[in-house]
Amino acid sequence: MNIKELTYYIQSANINFLIGSGASRPYLATLGSIEKLLTRLNDDMTSHFEPKYKIAEASIYKAFYDSVIAPNRLYHKSGDDYSETKKNYQNYLITWNSLLNKRHSRILKKQLNTFTTNIDLMIEDAANGMGIELNDGFRGSINPIYDEANFMKSIMQTSIHFQHTSEIPVFNLLKIHGSINWSGYNNHIVHERFWSYYVDEEIKKMGDDRFVNLFNIGSDGRKTEKTYEQIIEGAEELELLYEASEYDAFITEYKKFIIVNPTKRKFAETVLDYHFYELMRLYSNALEKENSVLFVVGFSFADEH
């Protein structure tokens, strides 16, 4: 496809993006082998329960928390990797905001749908203070509530002097696997400001040494991922020192995140929950519209669904 063809599609199409975990690199880790580990662990826990599996489950959740969730905390955001990742997202927002503004068509709305399987806050962070309209689906200001109907709205701007009205670009952010700052309350998804506090507190109470390290550290300091069997062996060793029930509080707090955990069953989990089902429906409807274009960024399509 040449530039002329691409320009035509941008001018005349409904624009959609699908953004995966690779887009948040190098600051945040990709899933790596966590999906395979959790899937196999779930199979073992379904067939027979033993305390070692609970310890392994907590350890894998903690590894995912440390590498993907915890770095989104405000005091973690620093360094070259963070700056590079944030800049990449800002360039994305600036470029497409300009392109939507320059659209000649008055038939198409100046909206761009950003569908993402990422649960991190990098896009929200990048948009903060830029003067760009990012619609994350929440309505209200004191206790914002998630409502998919918000993605059906357009934003108009009226000039001060001539009362001329024009549509301004809006980025709809549809997080189809949930988000770390989502919380459940009275059958609603609400915006959670203190999303990491309770998990952090449980980790502090327990200490890192109660979790299996998912990596082998070589004599040269290089890390290599442990096999599933090695993780279970590590859990068996911890089982001799700690009661499996000591991990309950951490697992309970972790599972309060309104996210789809990385397992091969995640598609089944997604369609069973009302809000995730609605987001998948919006994704499907967006692609079925006439003249729809989907750009895919940082998405490997490596998992089964």
Task: Show the residue positions of the predicted features.
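Gly/serine-rich nucleotide phosphate-binding loop at the start of the catalytic core
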Residues: 1-143, 166-169, 174-177, 183
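Extended, H/D-rich, highly charged conserved domains that either
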Residues: 108-261
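Short linear motifs at secondary-structure transitions and domain/linker junctions
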Residues: 85-91, 143-154, 268-272, 294-300
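SIR2/sirtuin-family catalytic core signature
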Residues: 1-17, 23-27, 110, 227-250, ...
